[in-house]
Each structure stands twice: as C-alpha cells, then as structure tokens.
C-alpha cells in the first residue's frame, strides 16, 4: 500500500532533505514527502499520493523508512532560523505542509515533532480542512 511513496522517494528524498536544510524548496516532491489526507488535492498526482485515512497515516508513520524520513525532514524544518513557511515552500506548498503536519500530529499524538512544526510555522494552528475531512 505504501510502495507508491517508497518508489517516489527513492530518487528524490535526498534532494528534498537538502533543499529543506538550505531553507528553500526548488523541485517538485511535496506530494510524497509531506502527504496529505485524501480530499484536499485535486490533481491526479495529489490524489495518487494522498493518505486515505488516519489508519494509513499511522501506517506511514510506523513504516521504518517513511516514518523515519518524515521525522528527519520535519526536524530539518525545525532547525531553520526563520518561521515563514512561504519563504521555504512557496504559497501553495506551505498550505500542503500545514495539512500534512496536521494529519501526522493526529496520527502520532505521542510524537511532538509535527505539532512543533505547526507551532513554529503556523502559530500552533492545525489545518481546518484536514480536521473537517477527518471529522475532528
């Protein structure tokens, strides 16, 4: 089920991590590095890489490769000096980050890193559309 993420990240994860560490996303990988709940993105790519529900988000988080990478790249975001997600990701992808961090904050409530990203970049606010889709 999660193979689509592993396949996509195989070629792009190192570049994505390097871009985040530099503080500026310059290539196209947001969908499969910071996935969102199904129902937000309308493109075929967004739909393909969407997470269907909280259970799949928990599986992603618990996966030995995907979960570790998500925590690592989220930690890289926390180590940046600034707190403007638009400066790092641009307008649209900064919204995708907020929804992804909201999803994983709910899927892994015992791991503070996702809420810490929300605290730093979004004043602690979670994404309202993600919450609505999840019925929270």
What are these regions (language model features)?
Residues 1-14, 129-131:
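Extreme N-terminal tail/first-helix region
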Residues 17, 58, 101-102, 119:
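Amphipathic alpha-helical segments within well-ordered protein domains
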Residues 17-23, 84-89:
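Short helix-to-loop capping/linker segments positioned immediately adjacent to catalytic or ligand/cofactor-binding
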Residues 19-54:
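Hydrophobic/aromatic-rich, well-ordered segments within soluble, folded domains that form packed cores
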Residues 39-45, 105-114:
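Short helix-capping/linker segments at secondary-structure and domain boundaries
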Residues 50-69, 128, 136:
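C-terminal end-helix/capping segment
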Residues 59-108:
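Mid-chain, well-packed structural core segment of small domains
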Residues 109-136:
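Charged phosphate-binding loop/patch that engages nucleotide di/tri-phosphates or the phosphate backbone
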């Amino acid at each position: 089920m999660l193979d689509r993420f592993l396949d996509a990240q195989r070629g792009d994860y190192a570049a994505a991590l390097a871009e985040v560490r530099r503080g500026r996303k310059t290539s196209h990988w947001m969908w499969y590095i910071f996935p969102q709940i199904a129902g937000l993105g309308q493109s075929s790519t967004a739909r393909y890489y969407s997470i269907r529900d909280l259970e799949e988000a928990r599986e992603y988080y618990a996966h030995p490769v995907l979960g570790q990478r998500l925590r690592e790249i989220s930690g890289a975001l926390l180590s940046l000096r600034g707190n403007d997600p638009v400066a790092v990701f641009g307008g649209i992808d900064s919204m995708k980050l907020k929804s992804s961090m909201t999803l994983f904050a709910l899927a892994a409530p015992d791991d503070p890193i996702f809420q810490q990203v929300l605290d730093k970049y979004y004043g602690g606010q979670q994404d309202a559309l993600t919450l609505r889709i999840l019925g929270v």
